[in-house]
C-alpha cells in the first residue's frame, strides 16, 4: 500500500512541476469608447497557444513557457495589435491590456 501511495505522490507532483508555466492575462477594450470587446483572439506568436476575451473583455492564457513573447490580437472590423517583448516567468502572471481601433474592411466590387 505504501508503494502505491508513493508512486501516486511522485506522479502527481512530477506532473505539476513539469506542467507549470506562466500566465498572461488582461482586458481588451474598444479604444474610443473604452467598452470591453468580447470574442477577441489573443495569440502568443510562435507557441500555438492563445485565448479569446470573455463578455467583459478579459482573457487569460495559461501554461505559457518562460520566455519573451509577442502577442497579437485578431478581431473582425478592428486593426490587429501586436505587443512585443512580453516577459513570462514560471508561476507568475504577466499583465497585458489591449485597446483596439475600428478598421474599415473593403470588399471587392
Give residue spans per PLM region:
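Cleavable N-terminal targeting peptides that direct proteins into the secretory/outer-membrane pathway or into
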Residues: 1-21
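Periplasm-facing N-terminal accessory domains of Gram-negative outer-membrane beta-barrel systems
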Residues: 18-108
Amino acid at each position: 500500500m505504501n508503494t502505491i501511495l508513493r508512486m501516486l505522490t511522485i506522479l502527481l507532483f512530477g506532473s505539476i512541476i513539469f506542467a507549470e508555466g506562466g500566465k498572461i492575462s488582461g482586458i481588451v477594450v474598444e479604444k474610443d469608447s473604452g467598452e470591453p470587446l468580447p470574442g477577441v483572439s489573443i495569440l502568443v506568436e510562435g507557441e500555438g497557444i492563445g485565448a479569446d476575451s470573455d463578455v467583459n473583455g478579459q482573457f487569460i492564457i495559461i501554461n505559457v513557457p518562460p520566455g519573451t513573447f509577442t502577442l497579437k490580437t485578431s478581431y473582425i472590423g478592428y486593426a490587429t495589435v501586436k505587443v512585443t517583448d512580453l516577459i513570462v516567468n514560471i508561476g507568475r502572471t504577466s499583465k497585458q491590456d489591449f485597446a483596439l481601433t475600428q478598421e474599415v474592411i473593403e470588399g471587392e466590387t
